[in-house]
Amino acid sequence: EMLNMIKKFKKSYFKILSYIILLILSLIVLLPVIFMVCGSFMGKSEILNSYGNTISSSGSENYFHIIPEQATLKGYLDVFLLDPAYLMKFWVSIMISVAIVIGQVVISCFSGYGLAKFNFPFKNVVFYFVIILMMLPVQVTLVPNYLIFNKLGLINSYLSVILPGVFGTFGVFLITQVFSSIPNDLIEAAKIDGANHFQILMKIIIPCSKTGIASLVILSFIDSWNMIEQPLAFIKDYLKYPMSIFLSRINETRLDIAFVCGVLAIIPVFILFLFLKDAMIKGVEYSNMK
């Protein structure tokens, strides 16, 4: 009995210790978000005083604090009512990200179905080529894409940002893994009933792969929402910049606006993660399959 009590104590001890460590790590990760949310309810002068030193008659005094002493909605009112440029950047990011997600899901489903369920010459070579392209840093493709879009007259167009995302190879790789896990017996049974490949894809494969496709949606949206290099390289008009670029261009005279825009920028990703967190974890598992 003594040994059992010792074992139970050790298990409880390590369990409590692991929870404490996870709590500390979670707080470290969430600390910038907490600063940003609290800072969005501060005025400009309070932000400067809170995150820096103020000079008084007695010398340099640090007035650092997180909770607003004089909470205000002025930053939010300025964003929503005073200057529409801030919200315009938000909707530009939404438009680009949604277009990329829809296009990538469509392309990935058709391509993944072909790679997963068709046998053709050099199939493995094509799949390995997809993996190689997926491993290339985005910076490597910027110059070739710029030259192509310049020839097509798409520079300073949203298409120059959307098209590379739509034809990204990560979605093809992920969906190929998802479709490969579906038994071929379902496809053979559908063929016996007279279904063509399009019907098989739409009525059997995709309904059986909702979790994998949902994971692609959230991973693709997050990647598109946070992209910086492509808009900087392909879009020249400042007014067309998405939120990710716009946030880095807000100067220190509008720190209250910067905090508010930062809060707005994390809302779509937070909502997606809230509803599709299980699908995202499943997608990571699929991406690690061999």
Give the location of each predicted region.
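Short, Lys/Arg-enriched N-terminal segments with co-localized hydrophobic residues
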Residues: 1-4
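A structural signal for multi-pass alpha-helical bundles of membrane permease subunits
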Residues: 6-290
